[in-house]
Amino acid sequence: MSTMFADTLLIVFISVCTALLAEGITWVLVYRTDKYKRLKAEVEKQSKKLEKKKETITESAGRQQKKKIERQEEKLKNNNRDLSMVRMKSMFAIGFCFTALMGMFNSIFDGRVVAKLPFTPLSYIQGLSHRNLLGDDTTDCSFIFLYILCTMSIRQNIQKILGLAPSRAATKQAGGFLGPPPPSGKFS
């Protein structure tokens, strides 16, 4: 059990190091560029401006005000898209690094149970959580599963600590895959 605990701590340490490496790469390729800084400031400004306009608008607002808000939303959406495209080049570099490091560490931890899950994972996740492990105990956790979970959560927290995470206003306006859905029927 003590080797399992040591493996778990080592994987968390590896995740912290790879997350710091990823943020370092992103800083070099993206965050320090003038284009990124300009776009980020523009998105922040537009998000706050749009939020204020939406708060002050009433149901009986004229078509003119609604059109202005729609134009501003479109401009914000375009700037968010441009910001995502600027970040894209670092995503390729980070993806390459993570894949190489994951392959290397996966070969080190191959076939070793690194943690014991307090639950039985869903059947479609078991292929990842029990990858390359012998036995039928589905609560055994493989390196790859723990590494992915740690890296995802640690990287987000490192971004928040370093002040590199997108602001709440920009995230709220952008929507996206995990963001809130855009309000429907409000201005149409």
From Swiss-Prot:
The entry's keywords: Calcium, Calcium channel, Calcium transport, Coiled coil, Endoplasmic reticulum, Golgi apparatus, Ion channel, Ion transport, Membrane, Mitochondrion, Phosphoprotein, Transmembrane, Transmembrane helix, Transport
Gene Ontology cellular-component annotations: cytoplasm; endoplasmic reticulum; endoplasmic reticulum membrane; Golgi membrane; mitochondrial membrane; mitochondrion; multi-pass translocon complex
Compartments (UniProt record): Endoplasmic reticulum membrane; Golgi apparatus membrane; Mitochondrion membrane
Any GO molecular function: calcium channel activity
Residues bearing PTM Phosphoserine: S60, S188
Coiled coil: 32-89
Side Cytoplasmic, residues: 33-86, 163-188
Reaction it catalyzes: Ca(2+)(in) = Ca(2+)(out)
Residue ranges within the lipid bilayer that do not cross it: 121-130
Disulfide cysteine pairs (residue numbers): none
Tissues in which the protein is found: Widely expressed, with high levels in liver, kidney and heart, intermediate amounts in back fat, longissimus dorsi, brain, lymph, large intestine, small intestine and lung, and low levels in spleen and stomach.
Transmembrane annotation, as ranges: 5-32, 87-106, 141-162
Recorded topology in the membrane: Multi-pass membrane protein
Ranges per topology, Lumenal: 1-4, 107-120, 131-140
GO biological process, one term: calcium ion transmembrane transport
Oligomeric and partner information: Homodimer and homotetramer. Homodimer under resting conditions; forms homotetramers following ER calcium overload. Component of the GET- and EMC-like (GEL) complex, composed of RAB5IF/OPTI and TMCO1. The GEL complex is part of the multi-pass translocon (MPT) complex, composed of three subcomplexes, the GEL complex (composed of RAB5IF/OPTI and TMCO1), the BOS complex (composed of NCLN/Nicalin, NOMO1 and TMEM147) and the PAT complex (composed of WDR83OS/Asterix and CCDC47). The MPT complex associates with the SEC61 complex.
Function: Endoplasmic reticulum (ER) calcium-selective channel preventing intracellular Ca2(+) stores from overfilling and maintaining calcium homeostasis in the ER. In response to endoplasmic reticulum (ER) Ca2(+) overloading, assembles into a homotetramer, forming a functional calcium-selective channel facilitating Ca2(+) release. Mediates ER Ca2(+) homeostasis in osteoblasts and plays a key role in bone formation, via the CaMKII-HDAC4-RUNX2 signaling axis. Component of the multi-pass translocon (MPT) complex that mediates insertion of multi-pass membrane proteins into the lipid bilayer of membranes.
Protein name per its UniProtKB record: Calcium load-activated calcium channel
